Amino acid sequence: MLKFIEHTGVVAPLDISNVDTDAIIPKQFLKGINKKGFGKFLFHDWRYLDSNQLKINNKFILNKKIYENASILLTKKNFGCGSSREHAVWSLLDYGFKVIVASSFSDIFYNNSFNNKLLLITLDEKKIDSIFDIVKKNLGINISINLLTNKVIINQKTFFFKLDEFRRVCFLNDIDHIDLTMNSLKKINVYENNIPFFLLNRKEFKSH
């Protein structure tokens, strides 16, 4: 993934609260561990009218042609609730979503998303309702997300959001926990070489 500074894309409105991970991707599709290929199972039971994916549910928002290239999902509170499954995040990313905007997310889904570089933007419910109003009156409209300024811009209106600074820096610089640890490797080695003997494990202590 490249550094995330700003993204502009079509926003798809999913006007549903408490979307759980089983709705995002049903349990029968969790067998693989490769992060690719899960997009076709995203919202499976809502997108299709049969288990074989032969009958499309034309009423579902993502099946409307105007949203076929949507990269931003707008939804309501408590998105990603239910059981912890990283596949839910993988399916959203593989489908093509880069950003999800909602009034709240489940804690586990929130952490899984950031660990996989899916950007989650939290706005209060009044702001979310305002954006829904704009989107419903302007089908297929774009939204711009700017991480340098912490702004959501749509239809010449600006909404400010807050994001944990650590996560923000990770997105802006395309780094993660491992990268940060590796950047401190010299300091870690110095510490380990100077650790007091009484903190060593039993095997290491005997060698001294």
Swiss-Prot record:
Key word Electron transport present = no
Q: Which reaction does it catalyse?
A: (2R,3S)-3-isopropylmalate = (2S)-2-isopropylmalate
EC number(s) stated in the UniProt entry for this protein: 4.2.1.33
BP term (GO), one = L-leucine biosynthetic process
CDD domains recorded: IPMI_Swivel
Q: Which UniProt keywords apply?
A: Amino-acid biosynthesis, Branched-chain amino acid biosynthesis, Leucine biosynthesis, Lyase, Plasmid
Q: Which GO terms describe its molecular function?
A: 3-isopropylmalate dehydratase activity
User: Its GO CC terms?
Assistant: 3-isopropylmalate dehydratase complex
Instruction: Give the InterPro entries listed for this entry.
Output: 3-IsopropMal_deHydase_ssu, Aconitase/3IPM_dehydase_swvl, AconitaseA/IPMdHydase_ssu_swvl, IPMI_Swivel, LeuD
* UniProt record similarity statement: Belongs to the LeuD family. LeuD type 1 subfamily.
Tell me which PANTHER family the record gives: 3-ISOPROPYLMALATE DEHYDRATASE SMALL SUBUNIT (PTHR43345:SF5), 3-ISOPROPYLMALATE DEHYDRATASE SMALL SUBUNIT 2-RELATED-RELATED (PTHR43345)
Under the heading HAMAP family, the entry gives:
LeuD_type1
Describe the subunit structure: Heterodimer of LeuC and LeuD.
- Write down what this protein is called: 3-isopropylmalate dehydratase small subunit
